[in-house]
Amino acid sequence: MIITLKDGSKKEYSEAKSVIDIAYDISEGLARAACAGEVNGEVVDLRTVLDKDCELNILTAKDEKGLAVLRHTASHVLAQAVQNLYPEAKVAIGPSIDTGFYYDFDHEPFSREDLDAIEKEMKKIIKKGAKIERFTKSREDAIAYFKEKNEPYKVELIEDLPEDSEISFYSQGDWTDLCAGPHLMSVKGVKAFKLLSSSSAYWRGSEKNAMLTRIYGTAYATKDELKEHLAQMEEAKKRDHNKLGREMKIFTTVDVIGQGLPLIMPNGVIMMQELQRWIEDEETKRGYVRTKTPLMAKSDLYKISGHWDHYKDGMFVLGDEETDKEVFALRPMTCPFQYYVYKAEQHSYRDLPLRYGETSTLFRNEDSGEMHGLTRVRQFTISEGHLIVRPDQMVKEFKDCIALAQYCLQVLGVEEDVTYHLSKWDPNNREKYIGEPEVWEETEEHIRQMLEELNIPFTEDVGEAAFYGPKVDINAKNVYGKEDTMITIQWDALLAEQFDMYYIDENGDKKRPCIIHRTSMGCYERTLAWLIEKYAGMFPTWLCPEQVRIIPISEKFNDYAGKVEAQLKEEGIRCSVDGRSEKMGYKIREARLERVPYMLVVGAKEEEEGKVSVRSRYLGDEGMKDIGEFLGALKEEIKNKTIRKIEVQEEKK
């Protein structure tokens, strides 16, 4: 048996060997640090026995996959601790996630004091150092085992598996869980962990099911790594848009209105309007024409497009197909509406490409458990557009869509924060998609070649395509490390036929166009959340709800402050006067806390000379300036959408 290691070196054995034995054969230090093995790309237990040639990578907590195994084991220690302290608690599921792990329990909510007690119990379990053992049962025996333990959620999971399934279990001491693994060799490997919070979550993510209590935690190989992560989490909490966006009066939510339906407050509306005007202007420069289409349509439209068969569960349906003559649905996308704009008149090959843009309000029936601030909502606004093109124009137009997205990211100052993904179909799950395999393979290859030609690093994600075509997803992480899609550009070689769309070619024949579905900047609400967290609320000046705060040093200079305000407003600057009888230092600190980029202090000298004393978040005290001089520089900064560097230390905090 020849084992090929990650560095290309080979180990030869005359008999079967476990992964941990091979790790010890390489070095004792590696074996002690090992969390799991990766055999031919599959993550397996260290206890897994190898008996044939393969490629092997020993995973430690320094590897993402190895750290995930450590965290998965931590979730089992958590579940054991909870059931030790609260025997009535029923266990559901407990996976590792990007930032740690969680476990769901059928139990009343846990307080911070409860979490502290659970942590202590986890430390006791870890100190005992029980070995982790894997064993299997038949499906029938596994169901009987968990029925006897009165664990209904485990029973339900097993009952969903095929009858001939071999069910995998992991035990640590006297506690056992249903699990596919892999896991560490012993609970002793969980050396640095922290329980972070407790929240509610529906069983299997559906609001039709029982509400469970979820405990979140994180774990690392060392206490220093954990300490660093917790410090980052504290900073993340300060930037969390769900907290900061409310404090800055950008948005709020109200229970009686519903989850996923945020109220955008006046400050948020200002920002969205600025973004919308900019995006629409940029699209107009690039030859887009605007449409305005209905918020709903009959089910007939979605049956033609395929959304009724492939996306109905994600739509808000109005009416009952069995009893109502007509059933409507709120639109989850704009594409079929813009197709009928195209079909309203005949087009020749000379008319193409046609680029339709619309600032659309869309509706998607997300699960309640998925709702979060502005990033996951049920009604949202998006810079949507569809390009109807000849096949020979497809590559150029698709590249131009990528270029527009990159330009928008650059202007917003977030181009270095994103990752690119080629989202492909899953040929093993064909019922999710329309079209033939060869069409999918061809269109995916076109996108792959384009990304390579543009020197854009990307990953390929199987099963993430839309049901009608592959796409480029441009993703970004929030402050907690969760990745969201910000911008999407899709290649569609199928829906033109569904809608009988055509153009007349140079020979007078009807030909099918191709379609590009794209966004310039994506969902406005999600972009707002992204910008709040990126800038910790200290937005570039052009986006700030309030750009200038005028601060008279005493009430007797309020009239002059009012004149300065009028002059700025005449030039389109968003500003206000703080004419209260508070101390000037207090008013300056308050303006800073409210993240106003410029403060203009006015007193006797400023009034006498017709000037203002400028204090900015960027440089601090910028000295006394003519109003015209300040205004000219400010207008230029806003026009160019400049992102000024913050150089004053107190503003960075």
Show which residues each predicted segment covers:
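NTP/phosphate- and nucleic-acid-binding module
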Residues: M1-A92, I97-K653
